[in-house]
């Protein structure tokens, strides 16, 4: 009988230890969850702090973009009106190319007009060595796969240029330039004629703020909301 009591007593002690161990593990899990939440909150506060230090958060990017839109030109409204007659009229005028370039920069697609300008400059080359150097420069910058400012060309056009780049002629980029010109005429040019940059030139209207800053503020607000919710956990 005494042996039985000792046996059951031993079982009770084991059960008590198991319960105590379970409670410790359960409590440790909660503590670990709270620590992870605090770490996440701290990381998000750090990200928000870095974001607040960025110049564009305070509107400098917006300011520079607005300055780009409002850049003054000496072109008259009468001359600017002619640019709406055709894309060729726009490209034939230096101020037209400049205004169109500024517009494309607001759409982050200025590589097209830069390629067109580079081709125009290339066709003015008179020395063979200069022709080769400029041809390679254009190829490296605009044509080859993964070029820093690669333009949208079909495979055949790119292949022809690639094969002739070692011995270029003044017409090596004609097909590519024509292709890019068509893309701009049927796409970007139509939007340019409705843009603030062009309307400002022909009407002298005040520039409306671009929506670039609003996007930045929306992003910042979302970041702040995440941090705010995690700070509540922290507290």
Swiss-Prot record:
InterPro entries: RGS, RGS_sf, RGS_subdom1/3, RGS_subdomain_2. The modification Phosphoserine is found at residues 49, 216, 218. The keyword Phosphoprotein applies. It is found in: Cytoplasm. PROSITE patterns: RGS. Its main location: cytoplasm. One of its GO terms (cellular component) is cytoplasm. Keywords: Cytoplasm, Phosphoprotein, Signal transduction inhibitor. The keyword Cytoplasm applies. Residues 86-202 form the RGS domain. GO terms for molecular function: GTPase activator activity. GO terms for biological process: G protein-coupled receptor signaling pathway; negative regulation of signal transduction; regulation of G protein-coupled receptor signaling pathway. Inhibits signal transduction by increasing the GTPase activity of G protein alpha subunits thereby driving them into their inactive GDP-bound form. Binds to G(i) alpha-1, G(i) alpha-2, G(i) alpha-3 and G(q) alpha. This is Regulator of G-protein signaling 18. It comes from Rattus norvegicus (Rat).
